[in-house]
């Protein structure tokens, strides 16, 4: 566990790239379908209850939310996608903004794709995997809500997803995760450390 993530704070919500902070430093983006536990995962990784807003209404996150950790490193919460009740105009805007961000943001160092372990590899997940693979953006899959299964069953389901990832998207890494049980925090921090350059030494020096 790296406590440097606990100092993350909210900076801004941007509807598109033009209103994002300057394209510098390092960013890791969190993406995922609506209601997969993306906001809860960010809150757990930063040890904060409400840094990223959680809602029982899927599709509530409609803007790009930026959470700086240091002057040179930030987490980015991308809009939750794929919920039918989101207005069509909003969906069209998301469909434009997401590929623009992935392809055009120089600060982007990696994407954490959040999937519900109960319903992994949806059409949206596969689209994200294809996009990131085509653009060359490193991707780590966070299989959330592992607490809904017994430990052995969660591990087996994760390994099944891992086999599919290796077969279709070589190089993509994955792990199981539970926000409520704080399962997988150390492993996720290690991946973020690598992408953001925030190893233990960075945390001690600030």
UniProtKB/Swiss-Prot annotation:
User: Which cofactor is essential here?
Assistant: Mg(2+)
Which keywords does this Swiss-Prot/TrEMBL entry list? Cell cycle, Cell division, GTP-binding, Magnesium, Metal-binding, Nucleotide-binding, Septation
The Gene Ontology CC terms held by the record are:
cytosol
Q: Describe the location of the EngB-type G domain by residue ranges.
A: 24-198
**Entry-linked PROSITE patterns:** G_ENGB (PS51706)
Query: In which residues is GTP bound?
Result: 32-39, 59-63, 77-80, 144-147, 177-179
* Keyword Cell division applies: yes
Q: Write down the superkingdom of origin.
A: Bacteria
> Could you give a single Gene Ontology term from the biological process aspect?
division septum assembly
Residue positions binding Mg(2+): 39, 61
Checking InterPro entries in the record gives:
G_ENGB_dom, GTP-bd, GTP-bd_ribosome_bio_YsxC, P-loop_NTPase
Q: Pfam families, alphabetically?
A: MMR_HSR1 (PF01926)
Q: From the UniProt record, which GO molecular function terms apply? A: GTP binding; metal ion binding
Q: What is the annotated signal peptide range for this record? A: none
As for family, the record states:
Belongs to the TRAFAC class TrmE-Era-EngA-EngB-Septin-like GTPase superfamily. EngB GTPase family.
The protein's job, in short, is: Necessary for normal cell division and for the maintenance of normal septation.
Q: PANTHER family of this UniProt entry?
A: ENGB-TYPE G DOMAIN-CONTAINING PROTEIN, MSS1/TRME-RELATED GTP-BINDING PROTEIN
Q: Which HAMAP family match?
A: GTPase_EngB
What protein is this chain from?
Probable GTP-binding protein EngB
């Amino acid at each position: 566990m790296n406590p440097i993530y606990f100092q993350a704070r909210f900076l801004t919500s941007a509807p598109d790239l033009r209103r994002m902070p300057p394209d510098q430093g390092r960013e890791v983006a969190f993406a995922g379908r609506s209601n997969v536990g993306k906001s809860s995962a960010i809150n757990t990784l930063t040890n904060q209850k409400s840094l990223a807003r959680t809602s029982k209404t899927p599709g509530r996150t409609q803007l790009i939310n930026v959470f700086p950790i240091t002057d040179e490193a930030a987490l980015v919460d991308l809009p939750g996608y794929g919920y039918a009740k989101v207005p069509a105009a909003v969906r069209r805007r998301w469909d434009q903004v997401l590929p623009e961000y992935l392809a055009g943001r120089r600060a982007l160092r990696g994407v954490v794709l959040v999937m519900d372990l109960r319903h992994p590899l949806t059409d949206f997940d596969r689209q994200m995997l294809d996009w990131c693979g085509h653009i060359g953006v490193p991707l780590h899959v966070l299989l959330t809500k592992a607490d809904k299964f017994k430990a052995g069953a969660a591990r087996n389901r994760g390994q099944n997803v891992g086999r599919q990832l290796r077969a279709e998207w070589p190089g993509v890494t994955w792990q199981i995760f539970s926000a409520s049980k704080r399962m997988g925090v150390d492993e996720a921090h290690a991946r973020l450390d690598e992408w953001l350059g925030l190893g233990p030494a960075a945390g001690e020096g600030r």
